[in-house]
Amino acid sequence: MLLIPAIDLKDGQCVRLKQGDMDQATIFSEDPAAMARKWVDLGARRLHLVDLNGAFAGKPKNLEAIEAILGEVGDEIPVQLGGGIRSLETIEKYLDAGLSYVIIGTAAVKDPGFLQDACSAFAGNIIVGLDAKDGKVATDGWSKLTGHEVIDLARKFEDYGVESIVYTDIGRDGMLQGINIEATVKLAQAVGIPVIASGGLSNIVDIEKLCEVEDEGIEGVICGRAIYSGDLDFAAAQKRADELNGELDDA
């Protein structure tokens, strides 16, 4: 089970939002590259970046910070990024800069042909981000709820060749209410590609619960506010996940 620290970028700083609200941003660091280094030193095996300004603007907005992070840790672990990815040119630019994966969210829902083209051009590098509330997909930085069922879209995107799915329960994100395990497992069971859980991770119990269902196809979990607020000790949590995986593998 991969525990993946999130570094959410707004105006070049590392922040956390509550339920995607740009007006409810808590600044945790003015040096995102140093924050990336901290998580890698604590044992992170992948990082999850979000260009928040880009998500709302529809184009890259935190390139300097992203390049600084890649310069700091990009040679050591895979780095994935979402937010504002709406063109093949942007994807190419990011992959050339050293990103391992790009996450396509809103654009995948609104323009499935773009996602298909991206999967064809950059096979193995494309993750789809599905944000949902009560089983329905949301777009545009969570500001618009669609009528699309998450599982229907996930199956379609799997056919396109996406590498994995980041599934966020937006009713829980930034609220420390616990991961929506049931919905995440339901999605993972419906597709044959890995699912990364996101939204609401609050403590070590969430990690233990996720490890129990990892075999359903859950590859990892994105760690946000909980590791910044201190509710979750990242290094201890990754160690615990590794221990549990070892026990489950031996069973």
UniProtKB/Swiss-Prot annotation:
InterPro entries: Aldolase_TIM, His_biosynth, HisA_bact_arch, Isoase_HisA-like, Isoase_HisA-like_bact, RibuloseP-bd_barrel. It holds the Pfam family His_biosynth. Keywords: Amino-acid biosynthesis, Cytoplasm, Histidine biosynthesis, Isomerase. GO terms for molecular function: 1-(5-phosphoribosyl)-5-[(5-phosphoribosylamino)methylideneamino]imidazole-4-carboxamide isomerase activity. GO terms for biological process: L-histidine biosynthetic process; L-tryptophan biosynthetic process. HAMAP family: HisA. It catalyses: 1-(5-phospho-beta-D-ribosyl)-5-[(5-phospho-beta-D-ribosylamino)methylideneamino]imidazole-4-carboxamide = 5-[(5-phospho-1-deoxy-D-ribulos-1-ylimino)methylamino]-1-(5-phospho-beta-D-ribosyl)imidazole-4-carboxamide. Belongs to the HisA/HisF family. The active site is at D8, D131. One of its GO terms (cellular component) is cytoplasm. The keyword Cell division does not apply. Its EC number is 5.3.1.16. CDD domains: HisA. It comes from Burkholderia mallei (strain ATCC 23344). This is 1-(5-phosphoribosyl)-5-[(5-phosphoribosylamino)methylideneamino] imidazole-4-carboxamide isomerase. It is found in: Cytoplasm. Its main location: cytoplasm.
